[in-house]
Amino acid sequence: MAQTLYDKLWNTHVVHTEDDGTALLYIDRQLLHEVTSPQAFEGLNVAHRPVWRISANLAVSDHNVPTTDRSHGIADPVSKLQVDTLDANCDAFGITQFKMNDLRQGIVHIIGPEQGATLPGMTIVCGDSHTSTHGAFGALAHGIGTSEVEHVLATQTLLQKKSKNMLVKVEGTLPRGCTAKDIVLAIIGKIGTAGGTGYAIEFGGSTIRALTMEGRMTVCNMAIEAGARAGMVAVDDTTIDYLKGRPFVPTGAEWDQAVEYWREFKSDEGAQFDRVVELNAAEIVPQVTWGTSPEMVTSIDARVPDPEREKDPVKREAMERALAYMALEPNTPMESINVDKIFIGSCTNARIEDIRAAAYVVKKLNRRIAPNVRLAMVVPGSGLVKAQAEREGLDKVFTDAGFEWREPGCSMCLAMNADRLEPGERCASTSNRNFEGRQGAGGRTHLVSPAMAAAAAIEGHFVDIRKLG
């Protein structure tokens, strides 16, 4: 019987299935960070349990770490406690960890693939919503809660119910100025934030196959924002080429065996999906969110939607509430919206490809950030990304234009460290969520691609980067 990619990943990891469909899944890799792991380790200590498979875990501090000068440590006592606790727990249990001043430190969903700890055919979990990122490698990856983090540490298994299969098929050549971020925002705009609820989404089609691994990770990263349990892309040469030579990846004869096995992780011809959604890449335009949900998104050449045109009273009320929070008037051209701050970073868009795309725009415009922009910051996704960008001189491109070049971490994506918006400030952000207060109490977030964020920094407002030539 023909199987989907999700079917194959699920079936190769089921240990036991109950009559009600609940399955015990074997977990190949658990990624840990400082926010959702302390209670899990405490549970192990209270029960006097060891970590079942130490080598299956990889830890890093990312949410609370400062992105400014780290020589003075962490100023906030709560953040310091969380980071110190992860350090102590990993030392006590013998878990591999990249500590704050390790060159390999970075955002958990960037360092996993970067190190080759994320591999095709794996089940991967982390106490973090955007674990779906790792599905770009033909893996089954999703976020879990803290009690489940403890369960995986203790047993290397997890209780789950199987999701339905969805295929999001994007065909055609992506227009100039459009990126993977625009693809996934367009998808969410089409199906909504509940469109993927109950599903595992496979992203396919010629447009997805043409993306780099960095682009595929961006798309899978935001599968959760469409309501899906997981997002994934089939294994191909692009996947294999990216992984070769990375630290955690098999070598020699084991590499050849692994590649042969990994290539099985694609949907079979004739495999049946419960839902299929199709998009024409040629119709995608650079995207900008206007509201307080990723589904509240439109094209840069459009206007802020008018709630009066929405027939559904529930949706109309949500639109009105969002516009009030965002301080936007209906029918305002998106290009006329001024911004106060710029954030280029996060597990969605802080890889070297993203940094290069933003730097290209800054260099092309050849001006400093606009006078109305109070802060423009670039936060690389890892120490290795930062070092690579500096070797290429990209840091100087940004600093010469008035941007701040920071240390790696989650930063302003969720404002758990000192990087945040003040009430009423408007930000062009390359992150993944634009909820109320996400980047700081009263902050107003617009989600865009790195190129769009860079252009907004220079111009002081959103611009259609297709016009830049």
UniProtKB/Swiss-Prot annotation:
[4Fe-4S] cluster binds at residues 347, 410, 413. Its EC number is 4.2.1.33. Pfam families: Aconitase. It catalyses: (2R,3S)-3-isopropylmalate = (2S)-2-isopropylmalate. HAMAP family: LeuC_type1. Heterodimer of LeuC and LeuD. This is 3-isopropylmalate dehydratase large subunit.
